[in-house]
From Swiss-Prot:
Protein species of origin: Lactococcus lactis subsp. lactis (strain IL1403)
Lineage per the UniProt record: Bacteria, Bacillati, Bacillota, Bacilli, Lactobacillales
Highest taxon above the source species: Bacteria
Designated name of the protein: DNA mismatch repair protein MutS
Keyword DNA repair: yes
GO CC terms of this entry: cytosol
Similarity comment: family membership: Belongs to the DNA mismatch repair MutS family.
InterPro entries to which the protein is assigned, alphabetical: DNA_mismatch_repair_MutS, DNA_mismatch_repair_MutS-lik_N, DNA_mismatch_repair_MutS/MSH, DNA_mismatch_repair_MutS_C, DNA_mismatch_repair_MutS_clamp, DNA_mismatch_repair_MutS_core, DNA_mismatch_repair_MutS_N, DNA_mismatch_repair_MutS_sf
Amino acid sequence: MAEKISPGMQQYLDIKQDYPDAFLLFRMGDFYELFYDDAVNAAQILELTLTSRNKNSENPIPMAGVPHHAAAEYIDKLVDLGYKVAVAEQMEDPKKAVGIVKRAVTQVITPGTTIDTANSVDNNFLVAIDFKDKHYALSYMDLSTGEFKVTELSEFSAVVGEIASLKAREIVAGFTLDESQLKVFERQMNLLISEQLEIPENLLIDLSGLTALENQVASKLLAYVKETQMRDLSHLQEVEHYEIKDFLQMDFATKSSLELTANKRENKKHGTLYWLLDETKTAMGTRMLRSWIDRPLISNSAIQKRMEIVQIFLDHFFERSDLIEALKGVYDLERLASRVSFGKAVPVDFLQLANSLSNVPAIKYILGMLNEAPLEELKSQLDEIPELSGLINSAISENASRTITEGGIIKKGYNAQLDKYREALENGTSWIAKLEADEKAKTGISTLRIDYNRKDGYYFHITQSQLNSVPEHFYRKATLKNSERFGSQELTEIEEIMLEAREKSSSLEYDLFMGLRTETEQYIGRLQALAKTIAEIDCLQSLSVVAEKQGYIRPTLTDGSRIVEIKGGRHAVVEAVMGAQEYVPNDIELPEQTDIQLITGPNMSGKSTYMRQFALTVIMAQIGSFVPAETANLPIFDAIFTRIGASDNLISGESTFMVEMSEANHAIQKASSRSLIIFDELGRGTATYDGMALAQAIIEYVHDHIGAKTLFATHYHELTDLDEALDHLDNVHVATLEQNGNVTFLHKITEGPADKSYGIHVAKIAGLPQPLLERADLILQKLENKPLPAKKVADEQEQLSLFDFTENSSEIIEKIKRQNVDNMTAREALNFLWELKDSL
């Protein structure tokens, strides 16, 4: 016969049935309990003690629990690991409950909906995706800031790139996505996939500026958030449409290879452009700066508007210093507003709001003192919100704690009734002190004192040796080993007055605070607008600080121009890491008639750094930053495409060469004459002749059909002859100094092709064995003594012959052809060389 389930456990099972994919935290008194598999799994993940309910039964129920006051910490751990957590609260006072206490889930916390991200200034985006008629709609939201946007995309790769750039951790996927696409999100991108199949009619978004698909996906996202959060979300901003074509387009591979916001080694901020440019002082400014780097501008007027203000801040050191001090006093207004909306704001949050608002007049004053036209718009948008700051300053005590149940929140003078209760408490304390002194005098018991505990209330404490002196009007409350506790009618009367005052004071103070929280909600929109203005000011002062610190100059950007002229350019991040004195600057010149720069030179000589330097300079200029150069004249680029180094493909487990070709194809298909293309060693992932042929064909295609400004680094020195056939291609190389058998890489870009690759020298630096290096040098000399055909590479119709061996060499040649040297380890390369030697 099956064991009977208790009403409490049946209630748990009924609730759990509605949240099968979440850990259910079930409030029972002072603990949140977990049962069954949730308990087993949570005990392991959170290192909790696993116990059991009904231990003596045949099937004890696994159980684990966490104290209610520490629950947030445990919830954060689960959410950080990608789990959902449903929180079931007691919906009535257990003391007043008839039968089982009513319980219900009040919130489902997920990786994409958590707002308690106090230790991070980063956005926490939740994304929804849908697909219809060959178009994808993508909407994203940050519940912690209220940001809510939507766009439409034509390719799945663009969807993947957008999600990766947003660093989203959870997606709400439509049923129109196929299984392979869902696997990309779940397995390759490690995203939590949630569903929202129904959209309540009252949550349907129908904005005229959005397509039907955009309205649908934004509605789906809103419905999911409402369903999981179960509360008013007044801080959510109206959904805003955006187009990726309105910004400098860069796919995720480009952002990753250029290390804009995350480094490749650790996927962290250090050593990135974001790290370099971040001198922001507010959390909102930090988030906005990251979004600027992710989405540089393509409107020259908008770029110049930013640069004008950067220039003003750069020219006024003392005013900027005062501005920075004022910004330091501004807390995270966006997240504070969200906490108010969520009903999670505590007294300290309101003090932070008031302190933040108190710094706004100073910021406004400094902008006014600068008296510059470009600052007028920002100055006019600085809303001091005096009504809110006045309300908080009059209501909240400067010494208020983080909790709302311990009292001491509301200032004296804010509420007359509360002041009366507090006066009663203060009088009661003096009454008790007077009563204690009077009874000591009357009874002659010098050790008599009045104490308090929850069980006995107020009582007279009298030791065993003094019991004979206890007066008749005392009555016994409790007997201890060495003392006894007594009460009196007068003490009881004082206690009743004090307890009533304390209880009513606590209740009234709580109600007053909740009223303040509700009243503050009407200012959320103004707080969010203020936050955006302060964030923009913060970003611009940050760019000016970096420009001053690093010695940057204001670039000249010209609409419609195709001239690139950078004098003394530097790689911004490399220079910051290694120091300006050690960095070798380079000019970058692509005149009107030059579209392609073919770059040759040995490994480790600086080709990749040179190309990345150019891309970063363009990005910096188009976010409104000054740039690392002596002078810089640039066109406005509409997109940057890169193929730099081997990288993983988010969409599938493709080979390095397949990734190379896919990224090259993406650039070829999407680039325009206003784009920047950077190809580093394209074609190295396959056999030599295949790679060379493809590299040449790609160069010719870009030259003849696209006309984009292109930097193309290659080890195929044969390609340098292309400058004779292609009018818009120039050769440059990295200069080297060869002296007494030693080679020094000068890291300087010079006109013309390289005459040597110095691969053996690089191998020497890498520490390959000396016998191997000597053998390689002999082979190289033999190869160099065999002249190549004089005909231009551009006109070749058949595969080049690198060298001639003996009549029995065909087997060796085939071995070399089949070998993909780029994918060989050092050990494999060494073994292969010795194998070839033995065959000669």
